[in-house]
């Protein structure tokens, strides 16, 4: 494919229109200039032609990204770089033209930030490889990958495929556009900030070199962006692969392997893309399930949404719970979790009963509502005057009867187990 005249494809009306729609669809925060995505249409109407001419003449100058720190679950922070909405638009236009070119080069076992690929496919491929006898895992952690990409190495790799100097020029400008941290400018000597529309593609271009090296060595691997695992047949092989691949990453790609987090382990000790793994002795094969840390994160969010002191209606809480449940089940549907779903359904119903009980407030109101729900008068009176031991009351049989699964379902609550059974691909 001729890649010597790509800028005109990037600046074509059809490509720019698609880029605009995608940026607006993605929404996102404003960059250093304060222009919101809702103002992009008006901004392009005034400045669109000028931007195109600047790109053709290599005079377009991207603005610095705005640094945003996102806390990580295990401590520390993840640095995001928020470009201006105009730069997101230009980056998206570039990515749309470059992506089909590089898709032909990318490895089949690379799943992150690629069209029609997802984390679930990566997990299924990993399971298939494990069940072929590759039961030792080399889990390689790249230390601050997006912040440490070597610009010269990346541009050399891009230059092997892209022959349009205008495109090469603008990509490098984005890499060195700088960072604004609390109104102070800082040069971006290395890295491709997470948050830009072009960054995922650039990350895959760099790490495709790792994929090619692993393929050349005949290794079974799965990679999702910078999360990579290699599966081999013995502990000795795994340790050798860890040494050799770590050396390649650091010496050839100029990246840093975090040796404190990288490890050689069996599938049972692995956490990958939120999933854990276990050996099913009945089926005689490895299977995936939500990792304990993913479950803990779900429980924490569920508790936040059913907090009794949260001053919103119970119907709103149910709506937010449904969003959480559907999203979680949709992501983990390839895992085994029937028992977990049953337990979580029971917890959610109990938490909602506590919210409803508190909302009823007075003993007389509680008596009246329990009677309406079919509880006899004496039991309703005894239950209502139990005091403020809400957790104790809401676990009693009378409350399970009065506010049962069917009634909560009629109120709109989605069942985790039912949702999982409908979507599960391994049931």
What does each model-identified segment do?
Residues 26-33, 73, 102-106, 135-136, ...:
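Short acidic (Asp/Glu) and glycine-rich catalytic loops that position anionic groups and cofactors
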